[in-house]
């Protein structure tokens, strides 16, 4: 018998006591402030790890993930038991209403909120409505807490490193998070009522188990009753000789409250090799005895029985795995606890789960008269009360793959559709990303503008954030007005004027605001004179004159009159240098000539919460200047919002226009870098992807964006994007000849296929669609 297994079984032994209350049936003796618990004679700690896109990866990527997961299993401590738990829980109505649905505010936009909430509710109803959490619980026998704490510090570093290689990560849970797991399991439907503060509980003399225990717990022969629900624990009795890596994901897809646990006990390699060699000697002895019996019967040509030959071959292969293929011997068992409202439903669910197992040639059986031990094994206490272990190698354990597909369901996020694999809602909070800026890319008709408008609508209806749009094709005006925003038409014939020299409080954020305005004037002048025509003398004059016209304004503490372009040109004309006269002549067209739309004081209220800059009628001559001036105006607004504590969303449609001109591309790139520090997120969209990819600035912005929506792509663009963004061929199939609203999202390092189909029978769809026949 293997000593490690004997020691592990011994550590699980505990004197039997009849529980006198529900609290006493929960096998936790002590909890410590750092999240370590004492259960029986063992200490345990739990980590949460994230799902990864295993099911969506190419065969080569899956092999790499499988190898990395094998490495993680090989790194598990041999003197401890590791439990991998997949926790399926249904999202209850109260949670859904609080975390996803929009609250009405008693204004004229409530009708839109009600319509959007109907869409979200319908989409949630179409999904399996599951939230899936994944945990690792490590339990170890130690003499005291200090030894246990030292052990878990080492395990924490190993798990973080090995699961980090999988891009999953492992985060240790504190008492609040660990107790919440059990509270939500024992008291389904009361998730929002959980509150626990260790210091407060100690002060009041409360038992921590009071906060998580069910109202009642009664164990029967083949099921248990718990607080008005019934449950049952199953265990994996018989393994197939070959198991597909999708079995665990199929079981965990079951649309009911369920916990699936895999207990793993690695054996030290030297001990495992000795055990297997001993088994081989035993088999060889059996074969020798069989041959002696045959020889005694004068049967010298008989072949060794197939069973013995097969057993010898498999055992030698197992030894070869241990000694040459970096495999570990692992004892493992699988348990499932599932819940239902009635016994009839429970029996039906049990049959369904057993059928899923039989599809993989695996037999799940009910634990009879062991439901309590089974429950304590399946839940992430760190206990292993069921002894139905199976001897596996690292690879055969890794086939019980806990990974499937990543879910994005951030609190306070924006709805972007549903996960194409799991059908769960995709809700992303871009404010939590390292860089909240993003791109929406797709050919004409792929749903690019609709996606932008949908995000704008969601933000407008569910938050107090400010929204600013740059609209080159006059597609956002109707939606802006419906959301009570302001549409500002920027053209030579428009009554609206923008003063590019406006400065708001907070402009510059630590930088020299006059120097920034000087850079703006240099870009405007060079666009009029031609790229490369602005020399060092010109730049010095521009910088000097810009500083001069702001002198009185700065001296007054920002309370005086803000200068305008005519003030700047007059200052230039006063300079004695010949280059000053060249600048004055070059600026005449847009200061005093027919294109003088920016030579006035700003004459509209830009402080509306939602603002759309309409550039549709802007001619080619002034378009580069207009793009820079609008960005400068937005930068002013973003700076003011930052001081006021307001978040700003900036949406730029047809962003390729910026990349056509050197200075506007550079200005956009500066805003892209600067706005993150200003509490602002930019979103740029374009259908002219090939043209954007010719710009090094655009490529740099794309590669450094944490958020991307890729819709249907042209063949030439797919190859370039796959190379630039490191997206596999399998993943790119989700943007190849797909319908509008279908595609890929890249959120941080996660790549998720999505479907975003909005109902066409509502007012919101008509406001957001760009299809003429759907208006």
Where are these regions (language model features)?
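Extended, folded cores of ATP/NTP-driven motor/assembly subunits in large transport
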Residues: 1-403
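Hydrophobic anchor at the beta1->P-loop junction of P-loop NTPases
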Residues: 440
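Conserved lysine of the Walker
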Residues: 448
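Hydrophobic positions on the alpha1 helix immediately C-terminal to the Walker A/P-loop
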Residues: 451
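A short helix-turn-beta junction within AAA+ P-loop NTPase domains corresponding to the substrate/partner-engaging
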Residues: 484-488, 697-710
